């Protein structure tokens, strides 16, 4: 990819996410999913990894996605739709790995996520968010294994990069990239972001523009 193309995708991404983004749907079950239309990308990650904050930072909207300091608060698939002519949606998935939730609730979330991943033809990519302070955990590996089997394109995004020292961030990257080598279905490029500073947001938006271009 040339620098000119990278700059073009970054600018197109800026324009797309500067547009009007709205909440359109909340699905507590597969039966209540919205009709499939256009392309969708979903954000998965452990509880409190920063999914809602990332969506807000991407769209430049402080309160588009609700953020919570209570782990496991998001219990539904939350859909956001971009500008009318974009035909593009973001999906905030329920956080996983919250051990204090009732077992029945965890089973329900797990079933919802697995069924969504395997039955949504409009789902172009899943972005798996990993907290840069903690790196890949066993529960993340379990989710990556599920994604390997689901035939859905996925890419790992480090969040909260501003909350670790540069040397720790560099080591986290090395460790996560090593872990990803066990998952050949993973997109090879690791993205590093901070919702607080905006670092990595242009590159993440550009990645989605490339995805739209590939699927159009």
Swiss-Prot record:
Identify the residues that bind Mg(2+).
Answer: 52, 74
**CDD domains xrefs:** YihA_EngB
Q: Which residues form a coiled coil?
A: none
Q: Which GO terms describe its molecular function?
A: GTP binding; metal ion binding
GO CC annotations?
A: cytosol
Keyword Magnesium in record: yes
List keywords of the entry alphabetically.
Cell cycle, Cell division, GTP-binding, Magnesium, Metal-binding, Nucleotide-binding, Septation
Q: Which residues form the EngB-type G domain?
A: 37-214
Give an example GO biological process.
division septum assembly
Binding of GTP occurs at 45-52, 72-76, 92-95, 159-162, 193-195
What are the names of the required cofactors? Mg(2+)
- Does the record carry Cell cycle as a key word? yes
Query: Which InterPro entries does the record associate with it?
Result: G_ENGB_dom, GTP-bd, GTP-bd_ribosome_bio_YsxC, P-loop_NTPase
Q: Which NCBIfam families match?
A: GTPase_YsxC
The UniProt similarity line reads: Belongs to the TRAFAC class TrmE-Era-EngA-EngB-Septin-like GTPase superfamily. EngB GTPase family.
Q: What job does this protein perform?
A: Necessary for normal cell division and for the maintenance of normal septation.
Q: Which PANTHER family match?
A: ENGB-TYPE G DOMAIN-CONTAINING PROTEIN, MSS1/TRME-RELATED GTP-BINDING PROTEIN
- Protein name, UniProt field: Probable GTP-binding protein EngB
The organism is Rhodopseudomonas palustris (strain BisB18)
